[in-house]
Regions:
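Short, surface-exposed coil-to-beta transition loops
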Residues: 79-82, 105-112
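Low-complexity, intrinsically disordered terminal/linker segments enriched in charged
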Residues: 1-12, 127-146
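Short acidic-aromatic low-complexity motifs
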Residues: 1-49
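Short beta-strand segments that buttress and anchor functional surface loops
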Residues: 95-103
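Glycine-biased flexible loop/turn sites that connect beta-strands or occur in inter-domain linkers
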Residues: 118-119
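A solvent-exposed, acidic/Ser-Thr-rich amphipathic alpha-helical stretch
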Residues: 38-92, 133
Length: 146
């Protein structure tokens, strides 16, 4: 997988509000569907050198793509299985909703991507929520989601 192809999809998404290109770029970057995914080394090239990632729930910030690369290297294996549910947004800001499965420990995830005009990721803000059982009192008011 070539990072330049993913960057071109991101650049197209930014230039023309193209959600299909953004989704395809994310699928290729993450290795979803029939795509092989990018290694952390190639993914590195999709982020600006001054990239920032915020994780507000744990009050953590990673500054620089080099720091993110070190975090990726230290991540316990295996990486989670990802199901990309929805990609929405426009121009420089895109939101991805996904389900991440860490070996049976499932989390709902929202990632806000901020991209520059060249299709590079400048900033990510990541939110994680653990799944939980819905309360019985509202069962008649809602429908179950898959």
């Amino acid at each position: 997988m070539d990072a330049s192809k993913v960057q071109e999809l991101f650049r197209r998404a930014v230039a023309s509000d193209d959600a299909v290109s953004m989704r395809e770029g994310l699928e290729q970057m993450l290795g979803l569907g029939e795509h092989g995914g990018l290694s952390p080394e190639r993914e590195y090239g999709l982020r600006r050198p001054d990239f920032v990632m915020d994780m507000p729930q744990s009050r953590e910030r990673i500054r620089g793509r080099d720091a993110l690369r070190k975090m990726q290297d230290a991540f316990p294996s295996p990486a989670p299985a990802v199901i990309l549910r929805k990609v929405t947004g426009g121009r420089h800001v895109w939101v991805a909703e996904a389900e991440m499965d860490y070996g049976g420990d499932r989390w709902q995830t929202v990632v806000i991507f901020e991209l520059d005009g060249h299709g590079l990721i400048a900033r990510e803000t990541r939110y994680y929520a653990r799944e939980f059982e819905a309360p019985a009192w509202r069962a008649e008011l809602v429908e179950a989601m898959d």
